[in-house]
A protein has these predicted regions:
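Accessory interaction regions appended to the cores of large information-processing enzymes
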Residues: 1-322
Length: 322
């Protein structure tokens, strides 16, 4: 994916495998602006030093000297490691979490499963069951809870839980309780469609303006406010429809005799959605990267150039058609 990138993959080495690649910031348009450690050598030293105290972690080097694969115990495990390194002054990039699979005794592909226990008020029960159903969860038990509401028990592929926790909090308005337990390995269940809309992607490098943001927020939900440095290919919001959309959030209003720059003061913008590290890890897709620095967390497309992204998508469609 380009020189100067390291990679780490989150997975569970013993039970409940899940994974996500991460990298150094060499391919970022804003390298070294917020961190002290930006080189892959420093990233390697830090990752291998972590093995001395973090017994659940495993680090593997790849064919590329600046890419690594890190195996952990889940999304939270990776998030804690990334946040710790971020506060220490490291810059890195992370890609979408994935799940580790294995080949069973019969030669078939197997994946990890989790047992999910949920306590939820009755009014949100249907929404939770529907959301888990699309993630290939199977209901094992349903009974009244001790303090009211319903107690639900599911068995679900670990892949189905990736990105679900924040969605669960939204579905239950923060009133639900969710806990998981590793169940074991089972047959591969096939593709799981992620209920994910497209992204609003910055088409130019610059600083966001109220005028540019006001046009963009008509197309979806923004992640950035005015006065924020952005670059081409950076994800600045969630598209209200499927598919990514390029937007110019740096666009300025053309001044005339009847208009002045002070007229931007009259533009009212909806406050942007605060995307924490955990939320970003759950949001990014296969063609996205999460750029983490001590001062900011930014999501971007793996390929920053819009024309190159379209060509790559066309090649993928042609490969699938064959």
């Amino acid at each position: 994916t380009g020189a100067g990138r390291g990679g780490c993959t989150l997975g569970l080495p013993r039970e409940g495998p899940g994974e996500t690649p991460c990298s150094s910031s060499g391919s970022s348009p804003f390298p070294g602006r917020g961190g002290h450690f930006t080189k892959s050598r420093k990233l390697r030293e830090r990752l291998f030093k972590e093995l001395e105290t973090n017994v659940s972690l495993r680090v593997e080097e790849t064919d590329s000297p600046d890419q690594f694969v890190v195996f952990g115990r889940g999304e939270l495990h990776l998030a804690v490691l990334i946040e710790t390194m971020r506060r220490e002054g490291y810059e890195l990039q992370v890609s979408m979490p994935e799940v580790l699979t294995r080949v069973g005794e019969d030669g078939r592909k197997e994946e990890p499963y989790e047992r999910v226990l949920i306590s939820v008020p009755e009014e949100y029960q249907g929404a939770v069951m529907e959301a888990l159903g699309t993630r290939r969860a199977e209901l094992q038990d349903m009974r009244p809870g001790e303090r009211g509401g319903q107690r639900l028990e599911f068995v679900i592929p670990t892949r189905g839980l990736l990105g679900f926790r924040n969605a669960f909090l939204t579905l239950t308005r923060g009133t639900g309780v969710l806990s998981t337990l590793f169940e074991g390995y089972g047959p591969w269940t096939g593709a799981i469609q992620r209920a994910r809309q497209g992204s609003l992607v910055a088409s130019e490098t610059g600083t966001t303006t109220p005028f540019g943001l006001s046009n963009a927020e008509e197309r979806g939900q923004l992640f950035v406010g005015p006065g924020v440095p952005v670059y081409e290919g950076m994800i600045v919001g969630k598209h209200q429809r499927e598919g990514d959309l390029e937007v110019n959030v740096c666009k300025t209003k053309q001044l005339t005799n009847m208009r002045s720059s002070t007229s931007d003061m009259a533009i009212r913008l909806t406050p942007p959605t605060d995307m924490s590290l955990d939320k970003c890890l759950e949001y990014i897709g296969p063609d996205d990267l999460l750029e983490v620095t001590p001062k900011s967390v930014r999501m971007r497309k793996r390929e920053l150039d819009a024309k190159m992204r379209k060509r790559a998508q066309e090649r993928e469609r042609e490969a699938v058609a064959r």
